[in-house]
Amino acid sequence: MLDTGDDMMNKKLAKITKAHLEIQERHILNFWIFVDYEEGSSQGIGGIGLDTFDTDKKKRVGSAYGCEMIRRLLLTLKVDDFSQMKGKMIWVYGEGEFLSFKPTGLSLLRVDDYKAQPLIFSDVAAEFGI
């Protein structure tokens, strides 16, 4: 469990099977990191909108928040691009148990990086007032 101040988060051991950026059918930029958990289940982590709607331009545009989230994912997992994430063993932090487990962050294993600090998605959003 990870103490985040008010709440305790669970963590689950996982292996990344696939990771990519995509633009959804509604033209929303997001990331997905797919993992297999130690106990045998699988899950997609992400689906977080990395861009924003510009009312003046009447279209979606890039955002500082989205750029920072991508940057932090790459730095946290010690890779240069999303394709290098495949095969990495990570901790997935989240709330809930079993099928109701909701991922809220991730980190490398300490054996891979003794200084590994978790990337908690809501912490990055809070830095940008989101």
What are these regions (language model features)?
Residues 1-130:
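Short beta-rich binding modules
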